[in-house]
Amino acid sequence: HASTASRVHEMLKMRFFDILIASIFLIIACPFFIILSILIWTSGSKPFFKHKRVGLNGKEFYCLKFTSMKGLNEIEEAEQERVIFELDHFGKVNNDPRVTKIGNFIRKTSIDETPQFFNVLKGDMSLIGPRPITKAEMKIYGTKIKSYLSVKPGITGLWQISGRSNTTYSRRVAIDHYYALKRTRRMKIMIMMKTVYVVLFMKGAQ
């Protein structure tokens, strides 16, 4: 019972921290969000898009991002075929022709993911946790999916600071599993500190 009470206490403290940091960030970033939204709008895209992801206990939610790509039908036909092939076979696209000029910048700097602070405020995500996955990706996790579903997905996390795009998917699953089992306060502080370095120097971003 003592360990359960301690775990609940830790969760409440983390929730308070999430709300505090997300609120401060969104207030400060509001003017920047407006400017970036206008720039994306003038490039011919809607500023935001949402995609369904799986979170704590298997609950689905809409994860927010700034739009960084064109639609598939907006690129050349030959490139469309390449994109479809690489997505089907590798799960990602090298030198993706759908990425816009401004999209390339906001992806490299991870700015495209900053609207997820709204997800944190809502309670679907935490500041720290595994990267949110789709329902289709759940099968890749195998038996380790239980550990993924035991925590809230995060804006940053152990995998996100461990190379991100430079790591394999199986490595990502292993890292998410390890974090879910451990997730000590010391580990969370280390993740927050290293996140600043990773974002500033664009390590592992695509």
Residue ranges of predicted features:
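A short, structured surface patch at a secondary-structure boundary
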Residues: 89-151, 195-198
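Generic recognition of short, well-ordered alpha-helical interface segments
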Residues: 15, 46, 61, 94-100, ...
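C-terminal terminal-structure detector
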Residues: 3-12, 144-206
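Short, glycine-rich, amphipathic interfacial segments at transmembrane boundaries or analogous
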Residues: 49-97, 156-174
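A hydrophobic, helix-centered structural microdomain
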Residues: 5-74, 185-206
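Positions in alpha-helical segments
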Residues: 22, 49, 100-104, 136, ...
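Residue-level signal for short amphipathic helical patches enriched in basic/charged
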Residues: 30, 109-112, 128, 164, ...
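Juxtamembrane loop-helix boundary motifs flanking transmembrane segments in multi-pass membrane proteins
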Residues: 1-12, 94, 98, 133
